[in-house]
Amino acid sequence: MNILLVNDDGVTAPGILCAARYLSKEHYVVVSAPESEQSAVGHGITLRFPLWARKLDINEPFEMYAVSGTPADCVKIGLDVIYKDKGIMPDVVISGINRGENLGTDVVYSGTVSGALEGAIAGVPSIAISVADFKDPIYETGARFLLNFLKEFDVKRIPRFTALNINVPSVPYEQIKGWKLTRQSKRRYEDYFEKRIDPYGKDYYWMLGDIIEDDPDPKADYKALKEGYISVTPITIFMTNEELLKELEGIYGDGKNFR
């Protein structure tokens, strides 16, 4: 397959390099990744400023471009410039391997997940993948899983506007029990800010937080990881609350006319 590989940790991050080296054993891989770290930038794109895509001179079995933008920018450049200039299109967009998990409400902030969703908007089957350890992630486990997953899973089954969000426990591959289909959980953060003083005597604030995991759903994404499984969650860009919409339509119909 032809693969467009992006991330939010940056073009030289070990996660994307590990993924590229594994995937290029059996696939054609083009890396289009931010020239600097873009973690938690969400689905931002660059407007009213130029973008640069610089091909790197590397001794690797894949191509690598450093892009002066966000993960979503990297997907746009990868599809509309890099692959287009080759006269082909990727069969799948893969975003990762991310340093740290993207579970529950993480997906709202994640540049990694947004990279996959940008591919989904463009109509290319897309996958985001993260390893659930920020300090010492075992990327090889995620890379080996990806290579095997692409053999057994037909990416064409992923519809437009939908992506797979994959989270991998940071343990040796041999310790993984398998993978489970899961739902995006209500896992979230209770944030607070610590007031500090900079070297010039001015106040600044450092955001900290506690993880809240109280979702009763047995298919909640984070529960699969706690049980030693890889979590595979289909997510979509559409955010309409269908249940509330139906309830409000029962009260207001289509809405209310002012005139």
Curated annotation (Swiss-Prot):
Keyword Iron: no
Cofactor: a divalent metal cation
GO molecular function terms listed in the Swiss-Prot or TrEMBL record: 3'-nucleotidase activity; 5'-nucleotidase activity; exopolyphosphatase activity; metal ion binding; nucleotide binding
Superkingdom of this protein's organism: Bacteria
Cofactor note: Binds 1 divalent metal cation per subunit.
Family matches, as Pfam families: SurE
Family per record: Belongs to the SurE nucleotidase family.
UniProt function note: Nucleotidase that shows phosphatase activity on nucleoside 5'-monophosphates.
PANTHER family named among the record's database cross-references: 5'-NUCLEOTIDASE SURE (PTHR30457), 5'_3'-NUCLEOTIDASE SURE (PTHR30457:SF12)
Listed name of the protein: 5'-nucleotidase SurE
Organism: Fervidobacterium nodosum (strain ATCC 35602 / DSM 5306 / Rt17-B1)
